[in-house]
UniProtKB/Swiss-Prot annotation:
This is Chaperonin GroEL, chloroplastic. GO terms for cellular component: chloroplast. GO terms for biological process: protein refolding. InterPro entries: Chaperonin_Cpn60_CS, Cpn60/GroEL, Cpn60/GroEL/TCP-1, GroEL-like_apical_dom_sf, GROEL-like_equatorial_sf, TCP-1-like_intermed_sf. Keywords: ATP-binding, Chaperone, Chloroplast, Isomerase, Nucleotide-binding, Plastid. It catalyses: ATP + H2O + a folded polypeptide = ADP + phosphate + an unfolded polypeptide. PROSITE patterns: CHAPERONINS_CPN60.
């Protein structure tokens, strides 16, 4: 296919057109009075969306040149979403503002490379200031406020996420499922859960719920296949029978003959036992079994450690406060050795840091979450499929923002933090930078007021007036667009995670700098005649 090549100002202007289109479509959703965007779907009903990155992903323009601009600015939103999970609209608005200001200066003769250096230095200055001003999240109230703001000011969602984090811990898993009613509900699943159920229904102790429930159980954990009870398990089973304690057996597999012996002993009341297959596959299976051993304070019976089943004694077994096994899953609730569990969690965190594989990272995070604090499931309720999708997107944003706040702290929201830091940036840049680098820094100084201006504009008022007013007020004071008043943002609960604000600016300035230093654009040339014939 033939290519179309554009140079210098023509290339930058062509990109700017696409950027303008995407930025306008996304920025209408910003703030408490932001509007929704309706997206036509090829299959199924149209989708009503208030989420910046989802809108950005859906926009494809017919003009290849303009579409390149869309794709570039989309990167800022996507990267912010990957890192912080929220702030995608803010990132798009910031990138658009920096590009617009930068284009004017490049057209007036400024050196794009020097401008980019100034933009990068100014961005780093602001990032350091955000870190300096951020407050740690210390209580449930702050978590509720962050989640409420990020979910589109839905207080019920905010409280639900705060409750979930309180119950499963700050590293616990919060998953979202489609509910079966019109109300959104929170369900907490305590302890460590893995997706393996009982091998036989004959182990069931609660026939109404078809579950095995054991209190104060011993846990035998092995990566071996159990073939014969007499050969493999008899010594330990005799010891367990004397204690009258229930027994959970987790093994690679249990052969029919061994399984039959266990069931007979269970039905005769000699032994309260349940057997499940080990979760996972390959090396991951062994790691998960080691996690379970650490959680319960037991030992993994494996030949690698020189241990065999016929030599097992009671001291090698784990202990669980409660075990619940159904057809599909096993839940172990145990607080046998908290210090060892914490050490294991730290070890998994280090593995997460050094691994490059996103799949491996995801699996390690799952293991960490299961060890660290259990699972919270939010069952989303809605009257229609369209509402369901919108609610799920808002919930995802809220959960991500909350975790980001816990990680790096909080700052005043509603665009106020960046407006307050504009004065600091101006004074610093004037004293440190010169010529085109200074112009680059001042581009950032003007651009970081854009999110607040857009929030006020979406409310139907003049953003420039509000920005000038806020610059002269205390750092904690900002503009509440829902009430049109200047308020203490911390007291009013209008707060943003520092990580979201930082990531939004970092990714916006990175992409904008790349666009400003573009001198040539090569795209596929559209065949106009072919388009007409179609």
């Amino acid at each position: 296919m033939t290519k179309q090549i554009l140079y210098q100002e023509n290339a930058r202007k062509a990109l700017e057109k696409g950027i303008d289109i995407l930025a306008e479509a996304v920025s209408v959703t910003l703030g408490p009075k932001g509007r929704n965007v309706v997206i036509e779907k090829k299959y199924g009903p149209p989708q009503i969306i208030n989420d910046g990155v989802t809108i950005a992903k859906e926009i494809e323009l017919e003009d290849h040149i303009e579409n390149t601009g869309v794709a570039l600015i989309r990167q800022a939103a996507s990267k912010t979403n990957d890192v912080a999970g929220d702030g995608t609209t803010t990132s798009t608005v910031l990138a658009h503002a920096i590009v617009k200001q930068g284009m004017r200066n490049v057209a007036a003769g400024a050196n794009p490379i020097a401008l980019k250096r100034g933009i990068d230095k100014a961005t780093q200055f602001i990032i350091n200031k955000i870190s300096e001003y951020s407050r740690p999240v210390e209580d449930n109230k702050a978590i509720t406020q962050v989640a409420t703001i990020s979910s589109g000011n839905d207080e019920n969602i905010g409280k639900m996420i705060a409750d979930a984090i309180e119950k499963v811990g700050r590293e616990g898993v919060i998953s979202i499922e489609e509910g079966k009613s019109t109300t959104t509900e929170l369900e907490i699943k305590e302890g460590m859960k893995f997706e393996r159920g009982y091998i036989s229904p004959y182990f069931v102790t609660d026939s109404d719920r078809m579950e095995v429930v054991q209190e104060n159980a011993s846990v035998l954990i092995t990566d071996k296949k159990i073939t014969l009870v007499q050969q493999d398990l008899l010594p330990v089973l005799e010891q367990i029978a004397k204690t009258n304690k229930p027994l959970l057996i987790i093994a690679e597999d249990i052969e029919k003959e061994a399984l039959a012996t266990l069931i007979v002993n269970k039905l005769r009341g000699i032994l309260n036992v349940v057997a499940v297959k080990a979760p996972g596959f390959g090396d991951r299976r062994k790691s998960i079994l080691e996690d379970i051993a650490i959680l319960t304070g037991g030992q993994l019976i494996t030949e690698d450690a020189g241990l065999s089943l016929d030599k097992v004694d009671l001291s090698m077994l784990g202990q669980a406060n409660k075990v619940i096994v159904n057809k599909e899953s096993t839940t172990i609730i145990s607080n046998a050795n908290e210090n060892n569990v914490k050490a294991r969690c730290e070890q998994i965190r280090k593995q997460i840091e050094i691994t490059d594989s996103s799949y491996e990272k995801e699996k390690l995070q799952e293991r960490l979450a299961k060890l660290a604090g259990g699972i919270a499931v939010i069952k989303v309720g809605a009257a229609t499929e369209t509402e369901m999708k919108d609610k799920k997107l808002r919930l995802e944003d809220a959960i991500n923002a909350t975790k980001a706040a816990i990680e790096e702290g909080i700052v005043p929201g509603g665009g106020a933090t960046l407006v307050h830091l504009a004065n600091d940036l101006f004074n610093w840049a004037k004293g440190v930078l010169k010529e085109d680098e200074l112009i680059g820094a001042l581009i950032v100084e003007k651009s970081i007021t854009a999110p607040l201006k857009r929030i006020v504009q979406n409310e139907g008022k003049n953003g420039a007036i509000v920005v000038d007013e806020i610059k002269n007020l205390d750092f904690s004071i900002g503009y509440d667009a829902s009430t049109s008043k200047f308020v203490n943002m911390y007291e009013s609960g209008i707060i943003d995670p520092a990580k979201v604000t930082r990531s939004a600016l970092q990714n916006a300035s990175s992409i904008a700098g790349m666009i400003l230093t573009t001198e040539c654009l090569v795209v596929d040339e559209m065949n106009r005649n072919m388009e007409v014939r179609k």
